[in-house]
Amino acid sequence: MVRHGRLALTRRDSTYSSLAALQRENAACRACAEAGYPLESLPVFEGGAGQRAYLLGQAPGVLEGEQRRPWRGRAGQALRRWLELDEEVFYSTFYCASVTRCYPGRASSGGGDRVPARREQELCAFWREWELRLLRPQLIVTVGLRAARSLLGVRGLDECIGSSFEHEGAAVIPLPHPSGVSRWLNMPVNQRRLTDALALVRTQLHAST
């Protein structure tokens, strides 16, 4: 578990002129721990200036927290299969971020990972907002309902998967989460929605190359 002292450790400037400066301070962020939330890793994100596709997940898993690299577990493998990208192309194509940046730990019930509180999501939104300002991506792919809701305000996956939206000049294409525990894809109509969404992503990626 990430431990912190009595002094605030997180610094946030009022403005950033470079992605590198933003990333340095994001990597050192302990805002959620300072607010009293239990965290099991340090912030996880990956990417560089010039990447025009932005991938927004929900929260790192345990493996991502250990390696401090996004999409390292089985969900990441499934996502790359969906996108038909190998690891090298995947990481060179997408700036990888998430709604909350640290592995939140297991749920108290023992069934899966803890869902980050709304306040945690609000604290982490600062980093996403500045990433999008500095990167100005042409494409944003959200993965999971929490990620889609954070940008689009949607209530459910049914109303957004298979469609393209706009956010500050970028095309936003939501995907469901590729976790094996999700039941959303069990329905044939939702599988068709996923097929449509992936076709939209590929079209956008092709247009940006």
List each model region and its residues.
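A polyanion-binding, active-site-adjacent surface
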Residues: R3-H206
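Glycine-rich phosphate/pyrophosphate-binding loop and the adjoining helix
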Residues: T209
